[in-house]
Design a protein with these regions (language model features):
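Bacterial N-terminal signal peptides that target proteins for export
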Residues: 1-10
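Hydrophobic core
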Residues: 11-19
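Extracellular beta-strand-rich solenoid/capping regions of secreted or surface-exposed proteins
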Residues: 64-88, 97-125, 135-152
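Acidic Gly/Asp/Thr-rich repetitive segments characteristic of extracellular carbohydrate-active
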Residues: 30-59, 64-69
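Sec-dependent signal peptide cleavage junction
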Residues: 19-33
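Acidic glycine-/aspartate-rich tracts in secreted/extracellular proteins
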Residues: 61-62, 94-95, 127-129
């Protein structure tokens, strides 16, 4: 009987120990739903196909000229919002300079596409001086943000082409 009690106690202790994480738990978003980004890839990941965060906060100027062999943004760099989500892009006083050297590389002519009826992107600049800048090397029709469905709200900040 004593052996059985000890085994039960040992089993309970083992179950307790195995339930406690030994490594720190990491999360994509902070407790308030904010994700901080400092590159175009991080910005794309935070806005593309995810509902894990509600605020995407730019924490450093983002420059895209050096991407893809210094030709800037290409087709695979386009941000697609194709599912129901409500995101705030906080420029936080920083500049996002989206550069595309060749129109053929960004065939759609846009860099952010909102294409779901329940997708909403709000752009704000909580600090002041923040901007989305589209820099295109060729004389073609470009849109920084295309809204085929869904909603785009511009609370503050600047968009320059």
């Amino acid at each position: 009987m004593k052996k059985r009690k000890w085994l039960s106690l040992l089993l309970a202790v083992m179950m307790l120990v195995s339930a406690v994480p030994f490594f720190p738990v990491t999360a994509d978003a902070a407790a308030d739903g904010t994700v901080e980004v400092s590159t175009w890839a991080e910005l794309k990941e935070a806005l593309n196909y995810t509902t894990k965060c509600s605020v995407v906060k730019v924490v450093k100027d983002i420059e895209t000229k050096s991407l893809n062999g210094h030709t800037g943004l290409h087709q695979d760099n386009i941000i697609f919002m194709t599912m129901a989500m409500d995101k705030v892009l906080d420029l936080n006083g920083h500049t996002v300079n989206a550069y595309a050297k060749y129109y053929s590389e960004v065939a759609q002519g846009y860099l952010i596409n909102i294409s779901h009826k329940d997708a909403r992107l709000t752009i704000r600049d909580s600090v002041g001086g923040g901007a989305l800048i589209g820099e295109f090397n060729q004389e073609f029709y470009y849109e920084f943000i295309n809204v085929s469905k869904g909603t785009l709200v511009m609370e503050s900040g600047t968009v320059k082409m």
